[in-house]
């Protein structure tokens, strides 16, 4: 763990005093890795007393105090990536919500090689909290986190065991389940396309939840899976070869390419695309509640006695995931989806419930049982109504591999 934090060459150059000091700094990381403890999942925000009544910042910051600084590190720019664009909308939401109490800074095009330098730069600029929106930044963040324990660094990824960096994600599979229900109801030939990007933790749950939702409204539905990051990906050929009209594509538009190929849509014979549903990552709500949690002390109190790494995995109940239906969705289908969305928010139903089988027929979940969150997070298999497979590293384009090397589904990436 020590060499992982500081690097082999740096460790060789340390004096005895520096070695002793730095070993103490990263001791908790060493203990966590040697004991192979599981990730502690935080499924919903903790309710804070201070949120009731006065603005929470008034409890901690007098009017004369300097602004709280929150930094965002992006691997690309918002105008070229729908993922970064969604997070940047969240950053803007923070500034609009708390204009007098905090400010944000963002850095675009942060490569893995530049991560440590950029982190130190934003800390020198006064960053109190840092959100990294890509898993490939994790490795080079660990040393900075150990050296600056007063700065809170969070990385947007799932299933990562580090003491000094917490991770966060959102339960998009809840919205995908509902989107799948709509797709199943509208697919006249029972064929539905699901276009995924990276085979990483969380993505497989999204695919499987969509497939289960489709079978809920159409037991004959089959989900044809394609990967946009694979070497031979060709969307139009894939849809034509498989005679597919109903498609689940990327979740959002990007400013540079504001087309209609996002969310769930239907392709007409004349080539037009009829938008049906848009799953929504509401990162503004997530960032607002996370900062409130930190300032209210909940963030610190979540450090449990077991010392496990913490991963925030919030969903519809927290308001960080939603589903927007267009007027093109039939009224009866929309009414059913709205009812089930309300039930998911209340926790009355969960997408992964009852008997679930993988493509090879293996029983993955028993009848009358809800699947445990850890099992959902670590999925490395596809449900029996999915046609396609999880790609290997060699089948991916070169630019996609760094992300997958860090957070790829392990069974296929070995």
Question: Over which residues does each language-model region extend?
Answer:
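Extracytoplasmic "Venus flytrap"
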Residues: 69-90, 94-98, 105-112, 135, ...
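Flexible loop/hinge segments that line or gate small-molecule binding clefts
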Residues: 146-169
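Flexible, glycine-rich surface segments
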Residues: 222-279, 287-292
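Structural motif
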Residues: 103-122, 228-240
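An alpha-beta-alpha
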Residues: 91, 178-221, 225, 305-328
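Hydrophobic alpha-helical segments within soluble ligand-binding/sensing domains
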Residues: 169-190, 281-300
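Segments of small-molecule ligand-sensing domains
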Residues: 2-50, 297-414
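Periplasmic-binding protein-like
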Residues: 126-135, 154-156, 243-253, 273-281, ...
